[in-house]
Amino acid sequence: MKKNIALFAGSFDPFTRGHADIVERSLAIFDEVIIAIGINEQKRTLFSAERRQEQIARYYASRPAIGVITYSGLTVDLVRQTGATALVRGIRSGSDFEYERTLADLNRHLSGVDTVLLCTDTRLSFISSSAVRELISFGRDVSDFLPEGFVLD
C-alpha cells in the first residue's frame, strides 16, 4: 500500500513552534512528513542549511515518520524525487492565504500535486522565523518561540 507522504518545504531559519505545530498536525493526515529545507544562495540566513537540518533532525530523532532533508531547485521537482503525495503549508493570516493559494495553483499546474493548507494555531500565529531572527540579533531569549526542547546551536 502506498504511503501518504507530506512534503513541508521552507527555509525554517530558525524552526519555530509554529512549524512544529504544522508537522504534528500533518501527521494526523499523512503517514510521513518530510521537512525540506530549501537552499537559496541569494538569501541571507542566520543558520546554514546543514545546521538547520542537524537542529531539526536532532529534535525529531525519535520520530521515524518525520524526515529532514535539504534541497535546492523547485519544490515541485522535489515532490517527484521524494514520492510525496502532497505539499503542506501553514497559514497565519489572510495575506498568507492569498500568497499560498497562488503558489498552490502554480504547483498544481506544474506537477499536479495538491497543497494542503493548515491554519496555524491562533496561539502561535504571531510567531515567524523573521521575528525570531530579529530577536536573536538583539540578544533576546527566544525559547518561548521554539518547540519545547529545541536547541539552537
Curated annotation (Swiss-Prot):
The keyword Mitochondrion does not apply. ATP binds at S11, F12, H19, G90, I91, R92, E100, L124, S125, F126, I127, S128, S129, S130. GO terms for biological process: coenzyme A biosynthetic process. Substrate binds at S11, K43, T75, R89. Belongs to the bacterial CoaD family. Its cofactor is Mg(2+). InterPro entries: Cyt_trans-like, PPAT, Rossmann-like_a/b/a_fold. Pathway: Cofactor biosynthesis; coenzyme A biosynthesis; CoA from (R)-pantothenate: step 4/5. The record marks H19 as: Transition state stabilizer. It is found in: Cytoplasm. Homohexamer. One of its GO terms (cellular component) is cytoplasm. It comes from the Bacteria. This is Phosphopantetheine adenylyltransferase. Its EC number is 2.7.7.3. GO terms for molecular function: ATP binding; pantetheine-phosphate adenylyltransferase activity. Keywords: ATP-binding, Coenzyme A biosynthesis, Cytoplasm, Magnesium, Nucleotide-binding, Nucleotidyltransferase, Transferase. The gene is coaD. It catalyses: (R)-4'-phosphopantetheine + ATP + H(+) = 3'-dephospho-CoA + diphosphate. Pfam families: CTP_transf_like. Reversibly transfers an adenylyl group from ATP to 4'-phosphopantetheine, yielding dephospho-CoA (dPCoA) and pyrophosphate.
